[in-house]
């Protein structure tokens, strides 16, 4: 049974959120808290498997509560926030403080009662209950340090076939790098993109499962940390070395070749994919535009988005790397690709930038 602590200053929201967990077969609410201060104390005392956290609360807001919880008793925290631009900025700050993921709770309890919101809430909590909470904090230990400091994870770096990654780097010359990532992605991407040099010779296209306001905030954050130019994707952007584009949260990101040049497209269709933006949609378009000259990363995230796209990339002779289990916040998307036999190599998070540079023939960052 997954034990959940619900922190929200609204009585109506606390009841609505609690009802969802109590009606599910595998979740239960151990307690509720009306503000961040009480949430910190109850998280320490009750040791829940997952905490759901409001953003704006009296006495102590959600961001401060996240910092205190991650310092005193680290555990997965799911932020429940609004879909406003301000809400996106505050939520991203909470994730930098250590929150694992977020979900829009809308403006009323009626929004929560919508079936898709209930399913998303339960799905995220179930995934986070099995996640590695120590990886969430931006100022916390690096994934490599986390692996080496936990008994059952000590063999991660040596057991991951990093050497096979360098072997597959000669599979072909590359024209484009594509990345698919979900839960835990914002922090994972901050380990990868800023570690690449300005001379990295491939454009990079990223799908991170997030609403629109959040993807812009993520792109701005990565741009501020990186030597590469990072921006939220718009239709018609030229994909050239030194540029990184992040799919907008309400649009797909695809790649087309126009007059010989790789260019972004941001269609709303196909609507049938379970995610928008969809990793599969990006990967399929990359194969169609570049054939075998695609370097692919599948990183931390729940679900299987990217599996079929990775299969297409492999079938056409491209290269697929996956993040390993020990450094993934949620080992869902990488697991699906690895277990299908589609991964050329598996790397700990901190080794991914070096693997990308070796594959692309980029000079090491000084």
From Swiss-Prot:
Boundaries of every CheB-type methylesterase domain copy: 170-363
Any one of the GO CC terms: cytoplasm
Principal EC category: hydrolase
Ranges annotated as biased composition (Low complexity): 146-169
Record field: catalytic activity: [protein]-L-glutamate 5-O-methyl ester + H2O = L-glutamyl-[protein] + methanol + H(+); L-glutaminyl-[protein] + H2O = L-glutamyl-[protein] + NH4(+)
EC number: 3.1.1.61, 3.5.1.44
Entry's Gene Ontology BP terms: chemotaxis
Record comment regarding domains: Contains a C-terminal catalytic domain, and an N-terminal region which modulates catalytic activity.
Family: Belongs to the CheB family.
Protein name: Protein-glutamate methylesterase/protein-glutamine glutaminase
Organism: Salinibacter ruber (strain DSM 13855 / M31)
Lineage: Bacteria, Pseudomonadati, Rhodothermota, Rhodothermia, Rhodothermales
């Amino acid at each position: 049974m997954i034990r959940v602590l619900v922190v929200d200053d609204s009585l109506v929201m606390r009841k609505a959120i609690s009802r969802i967990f109590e009606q599910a077969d595998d979740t239960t609410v151990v307690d509720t808290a009306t503000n961040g201060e009480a949430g910190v104390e109850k998280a320490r005392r009750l040791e829940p498997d997952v905490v759901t956290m409001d953003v704006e609360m009296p006495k102590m807001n959600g961001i401060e509560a996240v910092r205190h919880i991650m310092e005193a008793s680290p555990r997965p925290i799911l932020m429940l926030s609004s879909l406003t631009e301000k809400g996106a900025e505050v939520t991203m700050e909470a994730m930098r403080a250590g929150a694992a993921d977020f979900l829009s709770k809308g403006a009323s309890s009626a929004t929560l009662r919508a079936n898709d919101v209930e399913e998303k809430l339960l799905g995220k909590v179930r995934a986070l209950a099995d996640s590695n909470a120590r990886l969430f904090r931006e100022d916390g230990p690096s994934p490599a340090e986390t692996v080496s400091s936990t008994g059952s994870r000590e063999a991660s770096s040596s057991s991951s076939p990093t050497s096979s990654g360098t072997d597959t780097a000669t599979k072909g010359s590359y024209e484009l790098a594509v990345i698919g990532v979900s839960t835990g992605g914002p922090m994972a991407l901050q380990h990868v993109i800023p570690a690449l040099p300005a001379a990295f010779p491939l454009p990079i296209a990223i799908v991170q499962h997030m609403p629109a306001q959040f993807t812009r905030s993520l792109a701005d954050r990565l741009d501020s940390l990186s030597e590469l130019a990072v921006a939220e994707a718009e239709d018609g952007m030229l994909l050239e070395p030194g540029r990184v584009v992040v799919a907008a949260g309400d649009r797909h990101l695809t790649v087309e070749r126009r007059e010989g040049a790789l260019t972004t497209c941001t269609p709303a269709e196909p609507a049938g994919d379970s995610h928008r933006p969809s990793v599969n949609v990006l990967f399929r378009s990359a194969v169609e535009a570049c054939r075998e000259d695609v370097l692919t990363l599948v990183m931390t995230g729940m679900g299987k988005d990217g599996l079929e796209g990775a299969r297409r990339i492999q079938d056409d002779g491209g290269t697929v790397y996956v993040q390993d289990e020990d450094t993934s916040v949620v080992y869902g998307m990488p697991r699906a690709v690895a277990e299908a036999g589609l991964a050329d190599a598996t790397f700990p998070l901190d080794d991914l930038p070096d693997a990308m540079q070796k594959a692309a023939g980029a000079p090491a960052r000084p």
